[in-house]
């Protein structure tokens, strides 16, 4: 745990520039203000649901957020060479295109209507909505990793923080941080444990119980002839899975993978884009994603693994589900 705190301190010491961080904060404030004042995502972008232009609008939003923050980093660090780097455009373009397809994907609606004659549409819709990332994010990134992401040799690889030759970070087997690492597990476990009392307190609030659990009784268990806990478990597994592609793309591909191009500069642009994917959420949650995204990004760069972020994200999500289930069960 001490090692990770030292890594975080070292990252801030090397990466922090008052002018860069202030400019990035202003850029974030502008994006947040425009989105929530004009309700850009909910009232405009989402009005194109089931329309081929829907993912294109997400692409415009995310590209603006990401490339704007990259420009700030290259400007203050005097790194115009980044914009002439083919690898930068290949990686950033891949991430932007496929995440925008994921955000604006609506094929699962059709699949849910067609499977089983649409008799369990609601259950299939909620499950397939969480699983569609297998096609839209995980598979494309895996193909990119296998066929486009050439591993640099030790003599030609650019300097990357915490890079140690001969480790799994240098071998093709580590798919953008998917290889588990012991480093940081104690810290991540502690961070998750600290959330338990907060989740417990939140579970007594009416607003919380109005949103959680996200699982809803759709009578799918009656259709399949199984106890309801079976359909609830299937849904919760699908729900938990949806955090995997988010961590894989943002902390894995955009931080660990992009470090070959930007080094420590991968974190800030990732944070801005990560904030933008929360624009449809309450403002407090969106703002908090900035701090969480920054911390998880630095730790992913340090550990060369996304498992810490997965542990925290999935743990909190399932913790809120369990707390809500217990509250509603106790009221019956």
Question: Model-derived features: where do they sit?
Answer:
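Membrane-interface helix/loop boundary segments of multi-pass membrane proteins
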Residues: 148, 166, 173-189, 211, ...
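Membrane-interfacial, low-structure loops and terminal tails that flank and connect transmembrane helices
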Residues: 1-14, 73-90, 151-180
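Alpha-helical transmembrane segments
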Residues: 15-34, 91-102, 190-195
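Hydrophobic alpha-helical transmembrane segments
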Residues: 21, 89, 93, 185-189, ...
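Membrane-embedded alpha-helical segments of multi-pass membrane proteins
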Residues: 56-64, 131-139, 232-233, 245, ...
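Alpha-helical transmembrane segments in multi-pass membrane proteins
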Residues: 39-71, 81-151
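Juxtamembrane helix-loop-helix connectors linking adjacent transmembrane helices
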Residues: 104-242, 330-332
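Functionally important transmembrane alpha-helices
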Residues: 267-332
């Amino acid at each position: 745990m001490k090692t990770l705190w030292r890594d975080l301190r070292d990252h801030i010491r090397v990466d922090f520039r008052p002018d860069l961080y202030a400019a990035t904060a202003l850029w974030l404030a502008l994006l947040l203000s425009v989105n929530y004042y004009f309700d850009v995502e909910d009232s405009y972008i989402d009005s194109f649901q089931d329309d081929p232009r829907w993912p294109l609008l997400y692409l415009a939003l995310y590209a603006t957020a990401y490339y704007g923050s990259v420009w700030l980093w290259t400007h203050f660090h005097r790194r115009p060479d980044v914009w002439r780097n083919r690898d930068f455009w290949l990686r950033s373009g891949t991430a932007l295109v496929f995440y925008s397809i994921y955000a604006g994907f609506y094929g699962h609606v059709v699949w849910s209507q067609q499977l089983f004659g649409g008799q369990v549409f609601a259950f299939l819709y909620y499950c397939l909505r969480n699983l569609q990332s297998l096609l839209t994010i995980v598979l494309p990134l895996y193909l990119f990793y296998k066929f486009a992401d050439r591993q640099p040799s030790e003599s030609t690889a650019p300097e990357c923080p915490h890079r140690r030759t001969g480790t799994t970070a240098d071998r093709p087997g580590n798919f953008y941080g998917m290889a588990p690492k012991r480093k940081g597990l104690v810290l991540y476990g502690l961070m998750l444990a600290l959330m338990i009392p907060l989740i417990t307190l939140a579970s007594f609030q009416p607003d919380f119980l109005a949103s959680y659990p996200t699982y809803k009784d759709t009578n799918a268990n009656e259709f399949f002839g199984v106890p309801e806990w079976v359909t609830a478990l299937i849904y919760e597994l699908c729900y938990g899975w949806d955090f995997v592609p988010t961590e894989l793309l943002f902390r894995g591909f955009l931080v660990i993978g992009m470090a070959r191009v930007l080094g420590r500069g991968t974190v800030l642009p990732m944070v801005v884009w990560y904030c933008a994917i929360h624009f449809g959420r309450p403002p407090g949650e969106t703002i908090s994603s900035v701090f969480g995204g920054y911390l998880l990004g630095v730790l992913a760069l340090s550990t060369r693994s996304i498992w810490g972020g997965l542990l925290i994200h999935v743990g909190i999500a399932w913790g809120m589900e369990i707390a809500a289930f217990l509250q509603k069960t106790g009221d019956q």
